[in-house]
Amino acid sequence: MKINLKNKRALIGGSSKGLGYAVAKQLAACGAEVTLVSRNESLLKKNIIELKELTGCDHNYLLVDYNNSKDYKKIIDEFFKTNKIDILINNTQGPPAGDVLNVAESDYEQTFNLLFQNTVNTSMAAIKGMKENNWGRIINMTSVSVKEPLSYLALSNTIRSAVTSWGKTLSIESGKYNITVNNILTGFFNTERLNQLNEEKAKKFNIKTSEVFEKMSEMVPLKRIGEPEEFAYLIAFLSSEYSSYINGVNIPIDGGLLKSM
């Protein structure tokens, strides 16, 4: 089985680094024309050069700040006035870590805009062209915490659950246009974000960061943290024709971390 995404255009959120950029590289390697989305222009420019060297094709980027949802919507709407895409990967940076008892009301509002509203706005803008083409893939990168909340991630646990519910609802309504919508429940992956969270947790509990990683790895039946490339393979499959009958599901990729069925 060879995944061929030639003549497909993909918009990939949060793709200056981490899981987002791993996905961008994999989709580009499969033949897609990708548009990277991030607020870090220096990294975006660097990545575009790397993708050109990897694929021999031109790719693009969109400079946005997810933390300003109003400006983000304006930029996204402007982009889709002249562009259509086939594949949308909804992904943003994560919200601040913290315990539920210490979260302010304003934090919920900010995280709602960051994780939920940006996802809705991007999807609604993208889906118009997908309907015209009678083909589309929308993939929401969420977290295993929507099924089993993780400690010290109150904001993420709460708002990502709304994203997955919304994604399921969208899948019901968009299926007749041959557009699939799926949610990826992400486990522990070797990224800068995970390093940051573990450093914060180490300070909070006065232990070494290496101990946090060791305990985290022990929680996973495979006894290790995942690599971004492993995540990207799943996204490439879901973006392809091979996934044409997979719709409206929450797919964990976590090394067996979730205990639920």
Predicted regions, residues:
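Conserved glycine-rich Rossmann-like NAD(P)H-binding loop of the short-chain dehydrogenase/reductase
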Residues: 30-46
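Short C-terminal tail/terminal secondary-structure segment
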Residues: 4, 18, 148, 236, ...
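Substrate-binding pocket helix/loop in short-chain dehydrogenase/reductase
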Residues: 99-112, 138, 216
